[in-house]
Amino acid sequence: MSVTTALHQIEQHRGNDPRTAAAGRMWSRRSTEYPDCLIARVEGELDAVGLDDFRALLGHCQRDGCRVVVLDLRATTFLCIRAASALSGAKSDAWRHGVELRLVSGRRDIERALQITGVRHQFRYFPTLRTALTD
């Protein structure tokens, strides 16, 4: 966890903010152009603090009724090894539910975390969000 993330958590705790530190950094929405697709986005650092929220986001996306879920990691600045590993299980779970989980990363350090964990080969490479939605 970075110092910035830790300080952010402390500030939220002192202010009795009911949201977790990761609450403003992860979201999902159905695509307006491609109604069978759901876009999930993770912004900032995805470290051990946000891991449970990340798993919850992936689970919610699989149960939304969309045929395709595109996980957009272009704004993710750090991906911990456990979060990268969680993608392997999420890919299998999605497949069992009849959902295709696609990934757009864009950053070299995020790609490296995916390669180290052996997860990268499970996902086709999509250079942009649009190609992940249209293919």
Q: What are the language-model segments listed below?
A:
Residues 4-5, 14-56, 75:
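STAS-typified acidic loop motif
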Residues 11-12, 131:
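A short, charged, Gly/Pro-tolerant segment at domain boundaries
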Residues 45-123:
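Amphipathic alpha-helical interaction surfaces in cytosolic regulatory modules
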Residues 61, 132-135:
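C-terminal alpha-helix
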Residues 122-128, 132:
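Short acidic-hydrophobic, aromatic-tinged amphipathic segments that line or gate anion-handling sites
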